Swiss-Prot record:
Pfam families: DsrH
Disulfide bond annotation, renumbered to this chain: none
The protein's assembly and partners: Heterohexamer, formed by a dimer of trimers. The hexameric TusBCD complex contains 2 copies each of TusB, TusC and TusD. The TusBCD complex interacts with TusE.
Gene3D superfamilies: DsrEFH-like (3.40.1260.10)
Record protein name field: Protein TusB
Function: Part of a sulfur-relay system required for 2-thiolation of 5-methylaminomethyl-2-thiouridine (mnm(5)s(2)U) at tRNA wobble positions.
InterPro entries: DsrEFH-like (IPR027396), Sulphur_relay_TusB (IPR023526), Sulphur_relay_TusB/DsrH (IPR007215)
Keyword Cytoplasm found: yes
GO biological process, one term: tRNA wobble position uridine thiolation
Cellular component per GO, a single term: sulfurtransferase complex
Length: 95
Protein backbone atom coordinates (compact mmCIF):
# COMPACT_ATOMS: atom_id res chain seq x y z
CA UNK A 1 0.00 0.00 0.00
CA UNK A 2 1.16 3.52 -0.74
CA UNK A 3 0.36 6.00 2.00
CA UNK A 4 0.64 9.75 1.50
CA UNK A 5 0.65 12.38 4.23
CA UNK A 6 0.00 15.88 2.93
CA UNK A 7 -0.89 17.72 6.14
CA UNK A 8 1.23 18.64 9.11
CA UNK A 9 1.70 15.60 11.34
CA UNK A 10 0.27 17.75 14.15
CA UNK A 11 -3.04 17.74 12.23
CA UNK A 12 -3.10 14.06 11.27
CA UNK A 13 -4.17 10.90 13.06
CA UNK A 14 -0.71 9.34 13.06
CA UNK A 15 -1.81 6.55 15.42
CA UNK A 16 -4.55 5.44 13.00
CA UNK A 17 -2.15 5.65 10.08
CA UNK A 18 0.38 3.45 11.88
CA UNK A 19 -2.29 0.85 12.69
CA UNK A 20 -3.07 0.49 8.99
CA UNK A 21 0.53 0.24 7.81
CA UNK A 22 1.98 -3.15 7.01
CA UNK A 23 5.42 -4.49 6.19
CA UNK A 24 6.41 -3.41 2.70
CA UNK A 25 4.21 -0.31 2.59
CA UNK A 26 5.64 3.02 1.49
CA UNK A 27 4.85 6.47 2.91
CA UNK A 28 5.43 9.61 0.88
CA UNK A 29 5.37 12.89 2.79
CA UNK A 30 4.15 15.78 0.65
CA UNK A 31 3.07 19.37 1.11
CA UNK A 32 3.11 20.18 4.85
CA UNK A 33 3.57 16.48 5.60
CA UNK A 34 7.29 16.85 4.87
CA UNK A 35 7.70 18.44 8.31
CA UNK A 36 7.33 14.93 9.78
CA UNK A 37 10.79 14.13 8.37
CA UNK A 38 12.68 16.87 10.21
CA UNK A 39 15.77 15.34 11.82
CA UNK A 40 15.42 14.54 15.53
CA UNK A 41 11.73 15.40 15.38
CA UNK A 42 9.02 13.66 17.36
CA UNK A 43 7.18 12.34 14.33
CA UNK A 44 10.26 11.08 12.52
CA UNK A 45 11.04 8.68 15.35
CA UNK A 46 7.44 7.43 15.38
CA UNK A 47 7.34 6.90 11.61
CA UNK A 48 10.72 5.18 11.52
CA UNK A 49 9.47 2.60 14.00
CA UNK A 50 6.89 1.42 11.43
CA UNK A 51 7.70 -1.43 8.98
CA UNK A 52 7.63 0.94 6.00
CA UNK A 53 9.90 2.88 3.70
CA UNK A 54 9.69 6.62 4.25
CA UNK A 55 10.07 9.24 1.50
CA UNK A 56 9.68 13.00 1.11
CA UNK A 57 8.79 14.81 -2.09
CA UNK A 58 11.91 16.88 -2.72
CA UNK A 59 10.08 19.76 -4.41
CA UNK A 60 7.91 20.25 -1.31
CA UNK A 61 10.97 20.12 0.97
CA UNK A 62 12.65 22.79 -1.17
CA UNK A 63 9.50 24.93 -1.31
CA UNK A 64 9.46 25.06 2.50
CA UNK A 65 13.18 25.77 2.85
CA UNK A 66 13.74 22.54 4.79
CA UNK A 67 16.43 20.92 2.65
CA UNK A 68 19.05 21.04 5.40
CA UNK A 69 16.68 19.87 8.12
CA UNK A 70 15.34 16.61 6.69
CA UNK A 71 16.84 13.45 8.18
CA UNK A 72 19.38 11.67 5.98
CA UNK A 73 17.57 8.38 6.61
CA UNK A 74 14.51 9.57 4.67
CA UNK A 75 14.46 8.93 0.94
CA UNK A 76 13.96 11.87 -1.39
CA UNK A 77 11.73 11.44 -4.42
CA UNK A 78 10.91 13.52 -7.46
CA UNK A 79 7.47 13.66 -9.05
CA UNK A 80 8.63 10.95 -11.47
CA UNK A 81 9.65 8.73 -8.55
CA UNK A 82 6.28 9.42 -6.91
CA UNK A 83 4.52 8.19 -10.05
CA UNK A 84 6.67 5.03 -9.97
CA UNK A 85 5.63 4.39 -6.36
CA UNK A 86 2.00 4.89 -7.36
CA UNK A 87 2.37 2.28 -10.11
CA UNK A 88 4.17 -0.11 -7.72
CA UNK A 89 1.26 -0.24 -5.28
CA UNK A 90 -2.24 -1.47 -6.09
CA UNK A 91 -3.80 0.82 -3.49
CA UNK A 92 -3.25 4.19 -1.91
CA UNK A 93 -4.38 5.83 1.33
CA UNK A 94 -4.16 9.61 1.59
CA UNK A 95 -3.85 11.14 5.05
Amino acid sequence: MLHTLSVSPWHADIAAMLRLMEHGDDLVLLSDGVTAAIADGRFLEILQSAPITLYVLQDDVDARGLAGQIADSVGRVSYTDFVRLTVKHAGQLAW
